[in-house]
Design a protein with these regions (language model features):
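ATP-dependent carboxylate-amine ligase catalytic core
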Residues: 1-61, 70, 74
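Phosphate/pyrophosphate-binding catalytic cores of soluble transferases and nucleic-acid-acting enzymes
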Residues: 19-30, 41, 87, 92-104, ...
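Structural motif
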Residues: 28, 42-44, 61-63, 92-95, ...
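Nucleotide phosphate-binding/pyrophosphate-handling subdomain across enzymes
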Residues: 43-44, 48, 52-64, 68-72, ...
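Conserved catalytic-core segment of NTP-binding enzymes
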Residues: 52-116
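Beta-strand->loop->alpha-helix junctions that form or flank phosphate-binding loops
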Residues: 96-100, 111-133, 149-153, 175-187, ...
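Acidic-glycine-rich active-site phosphate/pyrophosphate-binding loop
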Residues: 131-144
C-alpha cells in the first residue's frame, strides 16, 4: 500500500538496463519484483493483466487461474482459458476455480501437461454453506470454516482457491499454519463497486 522507494526503483532500472530490452509491462513487472525482493519480501501476490507476462517471473512457486467466462469481446472461453494457461510454469502448482466450464478445464489440463505444472481443482462437493445473512455468509471448505464478506458460490469458490493456494505454498516449503489461513480469509473485505445505501428499505448501488 506504500509507494516504492525511489532508490530501489533506480537500482531496479540499472539492473534492467544490464539485460535485454523488455516490453514496457514486462519491464515494470520485473522492476516491481526487484523492489519486493530488495525490501525483504519472501512472497508477493501479483495479478497479471496478461498471463504471458509470467515469462519474466520464472520462479513462481504457485499460480492461479480464476473463473473463466465470456469476456464480451467475442473470444471463446476455450481461447480465454488457453491464454490464462500461459501463467503456468514448470514444477509450479496452479490452482484453478471449482466448477469451471468443461471446455475451460480441458484447456487448462492440456496447458498444465505441456509445461509440467501440477493443476489443482478444488472439489465443489467439499464446499458447504453453513449459514447466509443478507450481505455475508459462512462456509466450510475441507475443514476450514470461515465467514465471507460476499454471498454466493462464486465467493465460496474463491475462498476454496485461497485455501488450496496456501496449502500449495506449504508443499513448496513455506510454513503457513491453519490459523493464518483462517485469519486471512476472515479479514477479507468487500471492496467491490456495489454499495448498500440503505437496508430498510434495501437499496443497492452498483457502480
Amino acid at each position: 500500500g506504500k509507494p516504492a522507494d525511489e532508490a530501489l526503483l533506480c537500482r531496479a532500472a540499472d539492473a534492467l538496463a544490464a539485460h535485454e530490452e523488455l516490453p514496457l509491462q514486462a519491464a515494470e513487472l520485473v522492476a516491481a519484483a526487484y523492489c519486493f525482493g530488495e525490501a525483504g519480501c519472501t512472497l508477493a501476490v501479483v495479478e497479471l493483466p496478461d498471463a504471458g507476462l509470467a515469462a519474466v517471473l520464472p520462479k513462481m512457486p504457485v499460480c492461479a487461474v480464476t473463473a473463466v467466462g465470456p469476456d464480451g469481446v467475442s473470444r471463446s472461453v476455450e481461447r480465454l482459458a488457453a491464454l490464462a494457461g500461459g501463467v503456468m510454469r514448470k514444477e509450479s502448482i496452479c490452482v484453478t476455480a471449482p466448477e469451471q466450464p468443461k471446455a475451460v478445464l480441458s484447456e487448462l489440463v492440456v496447458a498444465a501437461g505441456k509445461c509440467d505444472c501440477e493443476l489443482v481443482v478444488p472439489d465443489p462437493e467439499d464446499i458447504t454453506f453453513l449459514e447466509a445473512e443478507q450481505f455475508a455468509s459462512r462456509v466450510d471448505y475441507g475443514g476450514y470454516t470461515v465467514p465471507l464478506a460476499f454471498l454466493g458460490r462464486h465467493a465460496a469458490g474463491n475462498a476454496a482457491m485461497a485455501v488450496e493456494l496456501a496449502l500449495a505454498l506449504c508443499r513448496k516449503g513455506f510454513d503457513i499454519p491453519d490459523e493464518a489461513i483462517l485469519d486471512g480469509l476472515a479479514a477479507v473485505e468487500n471492496r467491490s463497486s456495489i454499495r448498500v445505501i440503505s437496508q430498510r428499505p434495501l437499496v443497492i448501488l452498483d457502480a
